[in-house]
UniProtKB/Swiss-Prot annotation:
Disulfide bonds listed in the record: 42-56, 49-60, 55-67
Organism: Conus arenatus (Sand-dusted cone)
Modified residues (Pyrrolidone carboxylic acid): 41
Primary localization: secreted
Protein name: Conotoxin ArMKLT2-0111
Cellular localization per UniProt: Secreted
Tissue specificity statement from the Swiss-Prot or TrEMBL entry: Expressed by the venom duct.
Comment on protein domains: The presence of a 'disulfide through disulfide knot' structurally defines this protein as a knottin. The cysteine framework is VI/VII (C-C-CC-C-C).
Entry similarity comment: Belongs to the conotoxin O1 superfamily.
GO molecular-function terms, A-Z: ion channel inhibitor activity; toxin activity
Segment forming the signal sequence: 1-22
Record-linked Pfam families: Conotoxin (PF02950)
């Protein structure tokens, strides 16, 4: 139990050290990449929808997998 706690604390400490001393050479590029991952495109009415493809109208009939107008 003590060994497990020591290992967890050591890993957390080393991770924190990496985060604080790591260089960010392409800060603007990373920010743009993060923003593009956060931007979601929606599927128009009549298009395919699922758990990962979202409708612009926010109405998906999952039994047929199609976006519908509300």
């Amino acid at each position: 139990m003590k060994l497990t706690c020591v290992l967890i604390i050591a890993v957390l400490f080393l991770t924190a050290c990496q985060l604080t001393t790591g260089e960010q050479k392409d800060h603007a590029l990373r920010s743009t990449d993060k923003n593009s991952k956060l931007t979601r495109q929606c599927t128009p009415v009549g298009g395919y929808c699922s758990r990962h493809h979202h409708c612009c109208s926010n109405h998906c009939i999952k039994s047929i997998g199609r976006c519908v107008a509300h």
